[in-house]
Amino acid sequence: MALKYPSGKEYRGNKPNAARRPAADYANRGMTLEDDLNATNEYYRERGIAVIHKKPTPVQIVRVDYPKRSAAVITEAYFRQASTTDYNGVYRGKYIDFEAKETKNKTAFPLKNFHAHQIRHMEQVVAHGGICFAILRFSLLNETYLLDASHLIAWWNKQEAGGRKSIPKQEIERHGHSIPLGYQPRIDYISVVDNVYFTR
């Protein structure tokens, strides 16, 4: 039975448009985790718990268009040097350095999310007695882990020798430490750092 408006025009109903899939945007892959960590670090700083900051990425600006002073647009820039890890700072008198990554994979963490220079930097931090780790999030499972750099480095070296290109989730569960999500702070990784690095 066809439905009609009082004017006699036929009612066609609301046909939903085909769901358009947004183009893949890899620039903000870790943005949710990054936002959570930035809020957590601000919480730690405000309460005098720890001083941890996100490292800025060193960029060399080459060309800027000035159509008008208030609308300057950077048209060409490049990274000055390879960035190391995402975050560093100090907690309880110890240097802390870590990388934060997330994946939509449910069964393993792809090592392609890391770069060789980041792994070498982690090796140097560990060699000098710093606390170094990765915070890994399985975004579809809403699970976040702290994995000590030694385990990440070992898996990286296996990959370099022709081994597996990802860390199985079971290995992260076995050697990593679950970080519960909360409200204040959002990702209380410092409580995990206390348990892993300060209760030996």
From Swiss-Prot:
Pfam families: RecU (PF03838). It catalyses: Endonucleolytic cleavage at a junction such as a reciprocal single-stranded crossover between two homologous DNA duplexes (Holliday junction). Residues 1-27 are annotated as: Disordered. One of its GO terms (biological process) is DNA recombination. Its cofactor is Mg(2+). It is an enzyme of class 3 (hydrolase). One of its GO terms (cellular component) is cytoplasm. Binds 1 Mg(2+) ion per subunit. Mg(2+) binds at T84, D86, E99, Q118. Keywords: Cytoplasm, DNA damage, DNA recombination, DNA repair, Endonuclease, Hydrolase, Magnesium, Metal-binding, Nuclease. GO terms for molecular function: endonuclease activity; magnesium ion binding; nucleic acid binding. Gene3D superfamilies: 3.40.1350.10. InterPro entries: Resolv_RecU (IPR004612), Restrct_endonuc-II-like (IPR011335), tRNA_endonuc-like_dom_sf (IPR011856). Its EC number is 3.1.21.10. It comes from the Bacteria. Belongs to the RecU family. Endonuclease that resolves Holliday junction intermediates in genetic recombination. Cleaves mobile four-strand junctions by introducing symmetrical nicks in paired strands. Promotes annealing of linear ssDNA with homologous dsDNA. Required for DNA repair, homologous recombination and chromosome segregation. Homodimer. This is Holliday junction resolvase RecU. It comes from Geobacillus kaustophilus (strain HTA426). The lineage of its organism: Bacteria, Bacillati, Bacillota, Bacilli, Bacillales. The gene is recU.
